[in-house]
Amino acid sequence: MADVSQRTQQAVDTAMAGAAEMSRYGRRLLNMLWDPEPTNDRSLNRPVWCLGCSYTNEPTTVDRPDQDASSTVRATLPTTPSTTTLPYPLKAVPTTPPESSSSSFSSSLAYDELLEDAGWPIAFLDDFESRVWMTYRSEFEPISKSNDPRASAALSFAMRLRTLADQGGFSSDTGWGCMIRSGQSLLANTLVICQLGRDWRRGKAARQEREILARFADDPRAPYSLHNFVRHGAVACGKFPGEWFGPSATARCIQALANSNESSLRVYSTGDLPDVYEDSFMAVAKPDGETFHPTLILVGTRLGIDKINQVYWEALTATLQMPQSVGIAGGRPSASHYFIGAQRSGDAYEPGSYLFYLDPHCTRPALPFHEDVDQYTSDDINTCHTRRLRRLHVRDMDPSMLIGFLIKDEDDWDMWKDSVKYVQGKTIINVADHDPARGMPAEREAAIDEVETLKGEFV
């Protein structure tokens, strides 16, 4: 009787899991069927940000001396988008200016007369397209399934059905690899900025770009392949092949793989807490106490229960406006995105901002691994970039996420500390001098010894 009851409960649990899964896929199908590309209302002239750079359609006005040098001519350069980065030292993270109080007839025309760029600054689109976009892939060397009896229960309902039909392992990560792909995107763009510079755009340094992308090929020989993320996830994070990764597991994989394969980049991870400790950070960035190595900070955090608490909206948006930003991996439950841009909402009655993201939920053939990167075709490289904009209002984001920052030197570190401290709303990252887990600094211990000695003298 107990066995019957247990089987009944298991059947009910499976049915409920299946219903929830079908509901989620139904919403995703609806989004795919109705997913118009966002447009930009030029009349509001709201800045749009991409990893610390701001773009507008506002005409640029320059001062230049007239030929007789007796007056100044103000020359307007129409349709030239401006690109700026945040100043140093940063005492407050700039936010986009407030919206106009209401829409106008001219603003409605901006949507009726759509241009090829949909109203977005061309420089912003070029920047967005130059960011590396990692997506689901198929037809790669199969990743073996786990023989652990707990593995099946860890998989989603859809993946359990798929494994029943296919006993040969996972030759595609569709349905389970989106957080890994978001993490790959974050790491790949960090390497691009480190090695090619923040101003790099598609069409420049093509061979160096191929060398970076080859490290993310869908092959065990590539250091940052899906295969190696899954392998380390199984060893260090208790994640089974085919199981969805969370921000914490993704951060641990990035840290381990990068520290093993990159001599020019270090990784500092906060784990599941938003606390950054300067002594621990410097131990990673300056292991010899002298030479500072560019260091990727990964902050794992949760900013609410089901949705992001509104008190964190401004601070979260501000992270994408910081020059050190390399994006956010997160999004929706079991449906991660890679966020790289932001723009304040154009509705005067709607607070908050829209965040622009690269969506990994698009399955393409596996990116091959080539020792000779000149063998990569243009089609191979094109699958790692997109000009198609997608955005999500901050209120609709999942509160669990992984936030990345690239600190290039000590000046960058000082600037970043100010950036995360002086934000509107409630701060989401805490910076402290000493990590309690590292024990008390030697000078602090000596000071306490002195106090104890003095105390003994007065007894």
From Swiss-Prot:
Q: Name one GO biological process term.
A: protein transport
Instruction: Cite the InterPro entries for this sequence.
Output: Papain-like_cys_pep_sf, Peptidase_C54, Peptidase_C54_cat
Keyword Transport attached: yes
Q: Which domain of life is it from?
A: Eukaryota
Asked whether the UniProt record includes Cytoplasm among its keywords, one would answer: yes
This enzyme catalyses: [protein]-C-terminal L-amino acid-glycyl-phosphatidylethanolamide + H2O = [protein]-C-terminal L-amino acid-glycine + a 1,2-diacyl-sn-glycero-3-phosphoethanolamine
Annotated stretches, region: Disordered: 77-104
Q: Which residues cross the membrane?
A: none
EC number(s) for this protein? Answer: 3.4.22.-
Subcellular localization(s) per the UniProt record: Cytoplasm; Nucleus; Preautophagosomal structure
Please name the catalytic residues of this protein: 178 (nucleophile), 359, 361
Keyword annotations: Autophagy, Cytoplasm, Hydrolase, Nucleus, Protease, Protein transport, Thiol protease, Transport
Q: What is a GO molecular function of this protein? A: protein-phosphatidylethanolamide deconjugating activity
Composition skew (Low complexity), residue ranges: 77-90
Annotated GO CC locations: nucleus; phagophore assembly site
The Swiss-Prot or TrEMBL record describes its family as follows: Belongs to the peptidase C54 family.
Function comment? Cysteine protease that plays a key role in cytoplasm to vacuole transport (Cvt) and autophagy by mediating both proteolytic activation and delipidation of ATG8. Required for selective autophagic degradation of the nucleus (nucleophagy) as well as for mitophagy which contributes to regulate mitochondrial quantity and quality by eliminating the mitochondria to a basal level to fulfill cellular energy requirements and preventing excess ROS production. The protease activity is required for proteolytic activation of ATG8: cleaves the C-terminal amino acid of ATG8 to reveal a C-terminal glycine.
Q: Output this protein's name.
A: Probable cysteine protease ATG4
